[in-house]
Structures are given as structure tokens and as C-alpha cells.
Swiss-Prot record:
Catalyzes the hydrolysis of 1,4-dihydroxy-2-naphthoyl-CoA (DHNA-CoA) to 1,4-dihydroxy-2-naphthoate (DHNA), a reaction involved in phylloquinone (vitamin K1) biosynthesis. It is an enzyme of class 3 (hydrolase). Coiled coil: none annotated. One of its GO terms (biological process) is phylloquinone biosynthetic process. Its EC number is 3.1.2.28. This is 1,4-dihydroxy-2-naphthoyl-CoA hydrolase. GO terms for molecular function: 1,4-dihydroxy-2-naphthoyl-CoA thioesterase activity. Belongs to the 4-hydroxybenzoyl-CoA thioesterase family. DHNA-CoA hydrolase subfamily.
Amino acid sequence: MLNSLLPADWLYLERIVRFGETDSAGVIHFYQLLRWCHESWEESLERYGLKAADVFPNILNKEKQPLVALPIIHCEADFWKPLQTGDHISIELLPKKISAGSFQVTFKFKRGDNYVAQALIQHQAINSQTRSCCELSTKINSWLAESLCID
């Protein structure tokens, strides 16, 4: 583990629905849910102890690129209840390793005691230079392994 936190510290997050994330009816635009998923995953990695620069490419610094890139190869979302401006929501991340080179994260969105949406995003590891499939990085493997220890 990169820090002394428990998995719940990096797998349970919160946010508030902002006005700019909604349409004229005050309900979130559908694509915001997938944006929130990615932001939640980034925050989870940061809370775990992984720096963004160790995981995500930096177009401005070609010399300090991660060897492994993690493009999204599949995503899906289900909406059960509308989310509106000002709603306080909790987001639970449920990572799962699929193979030596891929993993997925299920995101469960809850308002109060009610689940309002769920999404899934799958990533495939590729060599950032050759663009061919490869194994996940040690750091992502550690995040996955320790995330699966949650009760």
C-alpha cells in the first residue's frame, strides 16, 4: 500500500450536482455521468497515493510519459432516477481485474439511501509507444489488488 488508508478511503467518494452539469430542465446531461466516473477514478488513484503523472500521459512533457497507457475500450450507463442541481451524491467504485492487461470499474451512484445510476468503464493496457496490448503497470495492479480487499 502506498499509504495508511483503508480501501473505503479511496473507493467511496462524494460530490454535488452543479448547475452547469444540467440541462434546461435541471436534470444532468447523460454524458456527465461518464465524466464523473473518470473524475472519481482519478480521485481514487490520488487518494490511494498514485500521482496523475504516473498514470496519465502529459502532452507537454514527452520525456516523462508512463510506459503503459489505459484507453477506455467499453463503457455503459444506466439511469434510474433523475439527478438535479444541488443533489448530494455518493459514488462507490468497484474495481475488478479482467486479465493481466485489462480491468473494469463499476460506479454506483447513490442519493441518500437510493441508487440513482450505475456505470461501468473498461480499460485495456497498451504500451504507450508501440500501442500494442501489454500488462497493467505495477502501480495499477497494486491499486486493484488493495481495492479488492474491501469488506
